[in-house]
Amino acid sequence: RDREKAIFVDEVWQLIGASSNRLAAEFVLEIAKIIRGYGGSAVFATQDLNDFFALDDGKYGKGIINNCKTKLVLNLEDEEAQRVKQILHLSETEVMNITHFQRGNGLISTNNNNITVEFKASALEKELITTDRQELLEILERHRQKAAG
């Protein structure tokens, strides 16, 4: 308990969704419930809210949401935005914003306080996290040129 810890679970719907099993889902939910007590934090990410709430009528998805103090919402389709509206008690304006967010924009929700944010990455951060194919090819070419001298 004297060391900070963090766990990151990307595509968490695969562990708590309809195609998962209760044992895996229970484990993820337990992490969400107890990790702060051990000086840790957990980050869960998903792009598919329907699957996130699919197992046992959304029991695990709801449990995770309820145990996460801070939620970050990026661009969503209309249907998913309506679901998030109910869960996070968003206004119509916030829902409209969510459906029109561009890359780098999002909504942070904590303690029922919501704020729209714009994320700015440094050149190094962008290079490390981009998934844009064209940007990756440009980065690869720069590294090849640098290595060639």
Locations of the language-model features?
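Conserved P-loop NTPase motor module
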Residues: 1, 99-149
